[in-house]
Amino acid sequence: NDGVALASDLAALGYPGLSYLKSRRKRNPAEVVLSALRTEDLDTRLAEALPWVLLTHPDLDWQWLVHAAKVNDLQNKLGFLTNVARRLAEKLGRNDTAKLLRGQETALERSRLVREESLCHDSLTQAERRWLRTNRSEEARHWNLLTDLSPEHLSHAL
């Protein structure tokens, strides 16, 4: 099961929200993020862990991750998650990390896709899509994503 493997990978990286899980061998954080982005129906709890990965591992292989995201048309998802991680870094006073994340966000901005999609649930109903379209953040709207994820939802993970 992709979700179980991903949860184990996130636990191995030290994600506090999954600290109760027995973790596997630690994987490359960039690979974990890409694996999650490629999952069509990603558990919301796992999607919420992704900004934490970017915030906690700002030295990951961004060149590889951005390239792989673009090849798979995932740059909007990565751009939005990078935006959320940057806003968390700013809130926490991690200015160097925020600056690095802003640079990655700017690089992703240049290849932003027009297509609207869900951050983690490709199987959303039309009613869910309408609700998210109305209630999403300006950042989610900018990245053409249907999600209500925001830094305020993630304080438990820090």
Task: State where each predicted segment sits.
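N-terminal leader/targeting peptides and immediately adjacent processing regions
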Residues: 1-27, 157
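Charge-dense, extended regions
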Residues: 95-158
